[in-house]
């Protein structure tokens, strides 16, 4: 009867237990209703989760998929999630009793009489600390928040990896294009050199013109190894991102229509950053965890209750007597820290300060995310406005180079004008390549800043 009353009282106490500390109600942040710097509307619906698909480049998509599967950082992120899941299961186990089983057998005897006596013993014990003040449940809450933070960190790793792969790939394309332009210019300059040589041999030009043509060729040839080195460097960077060696990186130059494609992406509203940006989500989970830790610290101010029970038995050589001689015990205890109260109060203070700091970190993350998007929009708009100017400049410089060559051939201009026009043409062509590369990279940064690169 007493045992039944004791167990009933414990169950009632457990069911009526409270949850101390503040409840997390979600992080709050104020953002403008619209972006200050706007982007032209997207010409087609494109999910930010896989923004790279908007470039319509199968090779780029394949590289990013490979990186997702093999990159060490992605693997480590998955391991961190598994670790956080294990921590959560460990926290949840605190709600249940701890049970242990013991047993043994022995034999003893007398050397003179050659007799022996066997003995068996065993027992089952259990202990449980009812979560009266909610400390264990707050620990579970903190562990769940830590798991959410680990998942958000993995999504941030994924988003950053996609951006890094795309950037390295765009740099590779730019280097390949620069190499192509340099080789085309070299062919043009070699034809020019032959024309100058013919004019010198015919007595229509001076040897100085021939030497100037030779210098132009040498200067262009010197640029080719630099472009080739950049190509190798980009391939090495991609190999690391893909989690492989450079000999396994096989790239082919996409068509001009593919690498010149500049897609438009939907920017959405600033408020959508709160659920799209992994770093903001991670900061919110950290604030949630810090809030739960306050509850843990407050619960430690109150008495703790523990219950233990034991069932044991022992018998002699007749094992059948083992169960008939079993006994049990049930006990409860209450503990309260008395002389360390100041330290416990300070732990509450520390937890509350950590919560406030986590709140400010969340606010800072949100503000930085908004500013990053605005900076990306400004950069994209500037680069897009420059591209037509570079294209017009290249077209005009090409025409000027051709006209100066014709004037030189008929003797109405000297070779200095030809060399200057060729240099200006080459510079203008390289400006176009650089501008397109920067636009593609700017789009990658913008999509990442908007919270793209992972599926919510």
Regions found by a protein language model. Name each.
Residues 1-6:
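Bacterial N-terminal signal peptides that target proteins for export
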Residues 16-17:
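C-terminal motif of bacterial Sec signal peptides marking the signal peptidase cleavage site
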Residues 20-23, 50, 56-58, 63-66, ...:
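Small/polar-residue-enriched beta-strand and adjacent coil segments characteristic
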Residues 27-45:
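Post-signal peptide N-terminal segment of mature Sec-exported envelope proteins
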Residues 57, 70-73, 129, 163-164, ...:
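Short loop-to-helix capping motifs
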Residues 77-91, 157, 161-184, 188-198, ...:
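Amphipathic alpha-helical coiled-coil segments
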Residues 201-230:
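Repeat-solenoid scaffold signature
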Residues 206, 225-274, 443-456:
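Short, solvent-exposed, mixed-charge loop/turn linkers that connect secondary-structure elements
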């Amino acid at each position: 009867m007493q045992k039944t009353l004791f167990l009933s009282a414990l169950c009632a106490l457990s069911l009526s237990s409270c949850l101390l500390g503040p409840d997390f109600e979600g992080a709050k942040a104020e953002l403008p209703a619209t972006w200050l710097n706007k982007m032209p509307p997207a010409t087609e619906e494109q999910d930010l989760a896989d923004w790279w698909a908007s470039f319509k480049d199968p090779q780029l998509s394949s590289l990013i998929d490979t990186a997702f599967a093999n990159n060490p950082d992605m693997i480590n992120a998955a391991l961190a999630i598994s670790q956080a899941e294990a921590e959560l299961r460990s926290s949840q186990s605190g709600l249940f009793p701890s049970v242990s089983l013991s047993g043994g057998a022995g034999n003893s005897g007398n050397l003179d009489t050659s007799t022996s006596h066997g003995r068996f013993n065993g027992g089952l014990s259990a202990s449980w600390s009812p979560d009266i003040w909610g400390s264990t449940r707050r620990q579970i809450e903190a562990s769940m928040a830590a798991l959410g933070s680990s998942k958000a960190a993995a999504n941030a790793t994924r988003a950053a990896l996609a951006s890094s792969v795309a950037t390295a790939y765009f740099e590779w394309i730019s280097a390949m294009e620069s190499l192509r332009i340099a080789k085309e210019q070299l062919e043009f300059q070699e034809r020019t050199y032959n024309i100058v040589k013919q004019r010198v041999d015919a007595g229509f030009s001076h040897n100085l013109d021939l030497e100037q043509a030779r210098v132009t060729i040498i200067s262009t040839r010197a640029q080719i190894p630099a472009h080739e080195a950049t190509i190798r460097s980009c391939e090495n960077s991609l190999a690391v991102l893909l989690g492989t060696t450079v000999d396994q990186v096989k790239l082919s130059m996409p068509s001009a229509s593919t690498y010149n494609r500049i897609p438009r992406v939907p920017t959405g509203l600033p408020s959508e950053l709160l659920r799209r940006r992994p770093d903001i989500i991670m900061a919110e989970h950290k604030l949630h965890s810090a809030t739960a830790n306050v509850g843990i610290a407050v619960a430690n101010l109150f008495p703790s209750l523990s219950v233990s029970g034991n069932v044991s038995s022992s018998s002699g050589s007749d094992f059948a007597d083992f169960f008939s001689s079993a006994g049990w015990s049930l006990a409860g205890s209450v503990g309260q820290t008395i002389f360390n109260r100041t330290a416990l109060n300070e732990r509450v203070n520390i937890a509350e300060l950590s919560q406030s700091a986590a709140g400010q970190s969340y606010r800072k993350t949100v503000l930085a995310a908004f500013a990053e998007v605005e900076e990306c929009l400004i950069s994209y708009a500037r680069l897009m406005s420059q591209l037509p100017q570079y294209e017009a400049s290249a077209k005009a410089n090409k025409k000027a180079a051709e006209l100066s060559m014709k004037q030189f051939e008929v003797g109405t201009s000297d070779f200095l004008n030809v060399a200057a026009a060729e240099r200006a043409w080459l510079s203008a062509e390289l400006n176009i390549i650089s501008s397109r590369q920067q636009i593609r990279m700017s789009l990658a940064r913008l999509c990442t800043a908007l919270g793209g690169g992972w599926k919510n």
